[in-house]
């Protein structure tokens, strides 16, 4: 355990740094268990969404992120898992505050489960066949069965699986941390970059995750984190 995690933010995490917004709107975070205001985050403008998307696109198309060995991405995921685990008490405390769940649920599902997701995806990534040779018997297509071909007619293909690019993700408010981790970790292992739209009623834990992403050394633009209402969220997924 360490010091309490922040409860209020005035900036978004975009392109590797906390980035000011010209938004005048905010989301007020109210603790369901006490009814008290415990924090706030900005509400994204179109310009903020564009900046986050541009950062993700740049990191994907203009840097070596997608072509790095999967081992490097897995190591970053494991570093983040370790950081999450070290912060699990403060995270659980924050989640009880902003989500109103019990301490037990906060401990197990919200604070501990994401550690498992990041570690699991790192392990899967290391052993995943991103490239495999496939062999097909084309004899029947070449009339082999009817024509009595003596030579087998086979073809081999190298099938590669690669990242799709920038990925927007959203998680349900009641599973903000595990939901975000379940979506972002596999995208990261694949070599994608991500824009995370946090759930507005309880954005604070995922904003805390942004600082951890920064601290363990994810490159700028690989993971971007914003808060947005329905209109700007629709704009995000329209890209």
Segments from the language model and where they lie:
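Rossmann-like NAD(P) dinucleotide-binding subdomain of oxidoreductase/dehydrogenase enzymes
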Residues: 129-239
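N-terminal Rossmann-like NAD(P)+-binding subdomain of aldehyde/semialdehyde dehydrogenases
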Residues: 1-146
């Amino acid at each position: 355990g360490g010091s309490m995690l922040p409860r209020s933010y005035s900036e978004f995490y975009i392109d590797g740094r906390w980035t000011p917004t010209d938004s005048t709107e905010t989301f007020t975070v109210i603790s369901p268990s006490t009814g008290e205001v415990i924090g706030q985050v900005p509400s994204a403008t179109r310009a903020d969404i564009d900046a986050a998307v541009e950062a993700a696109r740049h990191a994907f198309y203009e840097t070596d992120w997608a072509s790095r060995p999967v081992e490097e991405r897995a190591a970053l995921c494991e570093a983040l898992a370790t950081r999450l685990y070290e912060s699990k008490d403060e995270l659980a405390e924050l989640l009880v505050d902003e989500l109103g769940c019990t301490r037990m649920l906060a401990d197990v599902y919200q604070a501990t489960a994401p550690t498992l997701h990041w570690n699991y995806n790192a392990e899967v990534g290391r052993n995943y066949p991103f490239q495999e040779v496939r062999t097909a018997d084309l004899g029947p297509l070449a009339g082999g069965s009817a024509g009595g071909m003596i030579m087998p007619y086979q073809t081999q293909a190298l099938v590669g699986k690669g990242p799709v690019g920038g990925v927007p993700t959203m998680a349900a408010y009641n599973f903000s941390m595990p939901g975000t981790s379940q979506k972002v970790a596999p995208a990261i292992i694949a070599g994608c970059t991500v824009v995370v739209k946090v759930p507005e009623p309880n954005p604070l834990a995922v904003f805390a995750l942004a600082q951890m992403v920064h601290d363990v050394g994810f490159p700028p633009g690989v993971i971007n984190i914003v808060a947005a209402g329905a209109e700007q969220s629709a704009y995000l997924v329209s890209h």
